[in-house]
Amino acid sequence: MASALEQFVNSVRQLSSQGQMTQLCELINKSGELLAKNLSHLDTVLGALDVQEHSLGVLAVLFVKFSMPSIPDFETLFSQVQLFISTCNGEHIRYATDTFAGLCHQLTNALVERKQPLRGICVIRQAIDKMQMNANQLTSIHGDLCQLSLLAKCFKPALAYLDVDMMDICKENGAYDAKPFLCYYYYGGMIYTGLKNFERAMYFYEQAITTPAMAVSHIMLEAYKKYILVSLILHGKVQQLPKYTSQVVGRFIKPLSNAYHELAQVYSTNNPAELRNLVSKHNETFTRDNNMGLVKQCLSSLYKKNIQRLTKTFLTLSLQDMASRVQLSGAQEAEKYVLYMIEDGEIFASINQKDGMVCFHDSPEKYNNPAMLHNIDQEMLRCIDLDDRLKAMDQEITVNPQFVQKSMGSQEDDSGSKPSSYS
């Protein structure tokens, strides 16, 4: 090894043994150019360092190796990164979360380029566990996990990180920006959409859309389009966004989503024929946006919505009559819709196969069984937990020096602007 590299290795060993992690972080930040100039010797450097004891030094070397314009032996590098993430010292890594996250982003991008997303899911899961301070902390690599899960069509591993409510963001030494936040909620929304958990999907799209912004984000635009479609499927209308939504949405994003607003407008007429015509009119737009599958589900949901409206008017109805009223092709298609809706608990009905009649029933739920009481109890506990968290966050803000300084300044401005009561 060149003498400069030997000095780097010795410094990493010494600072690691002394527990001087801040100084070690400064060293690895300054050593990027040195390592990049000695690419052929980097495997020797890795051999001289212990992954557990010298995690930050190994991280610096792997980060530089992955930053090369072309990677000569990807399989070897992948194995090195995989071993590092699974065995590195989590406490050390938290001193250089920006570099650690950068390495994970590089790994994700490389696997996406090679069309091998499945290989990275387990590795990125381990990386999140190493980096998180708690399960409710969002990191920039959560979005990487969701992206890999989507591309691999393997949703289950990501659900453990999507089903929790995020209360905190890992600052990553100031390197965290809005894009990974948006990616987590956008990709997460797509995963929930694929699983037909539309309520959770809507929440995730809403988080992406309502992110404070001064400029148009393509991710926010795509989330907005999907928000409209999922809202129609779930509620039969577009749910209004919160008042704190950025003005960027109304000023720029809405005009870029005209086809989707037209779809929502026609959907509200409850006329499937008109909706089909509009889908044909904007077929190219919906296909280009990769939203045609959701658009078809919107059309299907309109048929279901119209069938649900019939339950409020009729006690019994023939399948043929139902088909003509909701504009389905015939009794067979009407029967298919009714059976699916009964299975999903969207209506309560039975079909008499002899005469082809549908009998609609009242909901059997009386809200007096142990399961329902357990659900209510769980919801109450969640509300109590949320209240405790809000109080803790409020207290944290109250004692924040920046907040105190700003609030004191505004109070002085208010008192200075008040007219004197004395002449």
Swiss-Prot record:
GO terms for biological process: ubiquitin-dependent protein catabolic process. Pfam families: COP9_hel_rpt (PF22788), CSN3-like_C (PF21215), PCI (PF01399). It comes from the Eukaryota. Its main location: cytoplasm. The keyword Cytoplasm applies. Residues 401-423 are annotated as: Disordered. Residues 197-365 form the PCI domain. Keywords: Cytoplasm, Nucleus, Signalosome. The keyword Glycoprotein does not apply. Belongs to the CSN3 family. This is COP9 signalosome complex subunit 3.
